[in-house]
């Protein structure tokens, strides 16, 4: 982790430990990346994103390489963190189940906004159905 050089080594370590604790990995602090599972590596990435207390976290397929159980855990952790830290999350995903947990879903087709859903105005099941229809329409999945 990189910090401004005006921050002491002790303070940097304290922030790193705190971030790892927040994602449940303080006990794995001295492990190498190849000694961590995919879910643990994603949680380390989340911890790194929290170090400077950002107002926005950008996540590109944060659960893309994870099994469904690990994906759920990572998404619950992200939701908890953004709520606790008053942070916003902008996420790219192809997983409709994850997309329907958002407050807002923006569908892109060929790099252009196709639809913009606010989930407080529309039920999550309706959004899931619309996303399934879109996937069928653009050929990502069989109809």
What does each model-identified segment do?
Residues 32-36, 40-42:
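Conserved ABC ATPase signature
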Residues 68-70:
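Helix N-cap at the start of a conserved alpha-helix in ABC-type nucleotide-binding domains
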Residues 57-60:
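Catalytic Walker B motif of ABC-type/P-loop ATPase nucleotide-binding domains
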């Amino acid at each position: 982790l990189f910090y401004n050089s005006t921050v002491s080594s002790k303070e940097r370590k304290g922030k790193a430990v705190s971030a790892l604790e927040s994602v449940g990995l303080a006990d794995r602090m001295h492990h190498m990346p190849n000694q961590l599972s995919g879910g643990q590596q994603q949680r380390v990435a989340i911890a790194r994103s929290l170090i400077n207390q950002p107002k926005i976290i950008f996540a590109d397929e944060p659960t893309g390489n994870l099994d469904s159980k690990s994906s759920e855990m990572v998404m619950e952790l992200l939701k908890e963190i953004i709520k606790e830290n008053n942070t916003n999350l902008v996420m790219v995903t192809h997983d409709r189940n994850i997309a329907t947990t958002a407050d807002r879903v923006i569908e892109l087709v060929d790099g252009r906004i196709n639809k913009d859903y606010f989930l407080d105005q529309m039920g999550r099941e309706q959004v899931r159905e619309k996303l399934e229809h879109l996937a069928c329409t653009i050929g990502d999945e069989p109809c």
